Amino acid sequence: MASALGTSSIAVLPSRYFSSSSSKPSIHTLSLTSGQNYGRKFYGGIGIHGIKGRAQLSVTNVATEVNSVEQAQSIASKESQRPVYPFSAIVGQDEMKLCLLLNVIDPKIGGVMIMGDRGTGKSTTVRSLVDLLPEIKVVAGDPYNSDPQDPEFMGVEVRERVLQGEELSVVLTKINMVDLPLGATEDRVCGTIDIEKALTEGVKAFEPGLLAKANRGILYVDEVNLLDDHLVDVLLDSAASGWNTVEREGISISHPARFILIGSGNPEEGELRPQLLDRFGMHAQVGTVRDAELRVKIVEERGRFDKNPKEFRDSYKAEQEKLQQQITSARSVLSSVQIDQDLKVKISKVCAELNVDGLRGDIVTNRAAKALAALKGRDNVSAEDIATVIPNCLRHRLRKDPLESIDSGLLVTEKFYEVFS
């Protein structure tokens, strides 16, 4: 999958920090003896709960080789990837593009749900983000893309190594974008324990799933409204808590799984439950372009890309690099962006008067407004910033009224101007 692969480069650190590329990480084993209560053990980058009174067994983490191989091969794999349509070449759909950019700048916004007509470029736009994603530092060979500097994004094993004073091998890699297919099983998403090994060898081998690969990255679900509800629940819980827990055969295994969840779908094929919609930070509505000249331009641009992808991508290289620099700069100044107290009060007043349940709407609107101010290069949020993002932050949180003909986004906009005027 092209979009799930990222390019990597070794950070400039002393050579002693790096292990030989030809050596494979050893597979560690933890023995649990019958009749003993081990409590919570941390091993192999995962948290393991031993259960008192169980027969003797071993827990093996078989994932340690996966990321090291991917990181070593990522530069070569970039050349063989399917060409991605440039983000800056997308015509129109400004609302969707803005929501995606704000989530890249501040992943804590909570993802974005994109709903719209067929053939409006939803999947193309999301996958085109891969070229704009900034590089991040990860611990070499770690299957969970642990952050070597932030304990919040560290696997348990890496955190213990840091506490012991061990120097870590670090690589620079682009943020991953992982596609979740509709036919994926819960084991493929969350990770699986090999029961056959447990029966034949007395070993329980844990193999991380897509949530581990998406840690500190983006997880994209096309046609999310057709995904099984229990899988959507798993994705949203992991995205909100930042951890994935797998319970199998008396063993509880946890690992970091903090990612930006992006879903897209066609409302004609079914809606998400309101309680699930509320868990997405922002909601973008995409419509078919009606302007004839814009439609012609889109067709011509797509034709150019299909004819010669490399030449087409090169023609947008300068715009892509400029946008990537804007994103990197916005991420670096985001923590210094301030929002005045009176603006916070007005945001909450809009939410209250619209009868928005809970406080997620207030929180997300504040975060999105700050991210937009950072993208514009400012350190203070303006009312204009709030007006731009608040429809996308609240429209999917309003209670449905079957007798209401006006779009929920317009209701939010009307209430905003009523309160802020």
Swiss-Prot record:
Regulation: Redox regulation; active in reducing conditions, inactive in oxidizing conditions. Thioredoxins f and m mediate the reversible reductive activation of oxidized CHLI.
GO MF term list: ATP binding; ATP hydrolysis activity; magnesium chelatase activity
UniProt EC number: 6.6.1.1
Catalytic activity: protoporphyrin IX + Mg(2+) + ATP + H2O = Mg-protoporphyrin IX + ADP + phosphate + 3 H(+)
Pathway annotation: Porphyrin-containing compound metabolism; chlorophyll biosynthesis
Keywords: ATP-binding, Chlorophyll biosynthesis, Chloroplast, Disulfide bond, Ligase, Nucleotide-binding, Photosynthesis, Plastid, Transit peptide
Organism: Glycine max
Function recorded in the entry: Involved in chlorophyll biosynthesis. Catalyzes the insertion of magnesium ion into protoporphyrin IX to yield Mg-protoporphyrin IX. The magnesium-chelatase is a complex of three subunits, CHLI, CHLD and CHLH. The reaction takes place in two steps, with an ATP-dependent activation followed by an ATP-dependent chelation step.
Principal subcellular localization: plastid
InterPro entries membership: AAA+_ATPase (IPR003593), CHLI-like (IPR045006), ChlI/MoxR_AAA_lid (IPR041628), Mg_chelatase_ATPase-isu (IPR011775), Mg_chelatse_chII-like_cat_dom (IPR000523), P-loop_NTPase (IPR027417)
Nucleotide-binding keyword on record: yes
Subcellular locations according to the entry: Plastid, Chloroplast
Subunit structure: The magnesium chelatase complex is a heterotrimer consisting of subunits CHLI, CHLD and CHLH.
Name of the gene this protein is made from: CHLI
Organelle targeting peptide span: 1-61
Signal peptide range: none
Positions bound to ATP: G116, D117, R118, G119, T120, G121, K122, S123
Name of a matching Pfam family: AAA_lid_2
GO biological process: chlorophyll biosynthetic process; photosynthesis
Name used for this protein in its record: Magnesium-chelatase subunit ChlI, chloroplastic
Catalytic class of the enzyme: ligase
Cellular component, GO, one term: chloroplast stroma
Keyword ATP-binding: yes
Cysteines joined through disulfide linkages: C99-C190, C351-C393
Family: Belongs to the Mg-chelatase subunits D/I family.
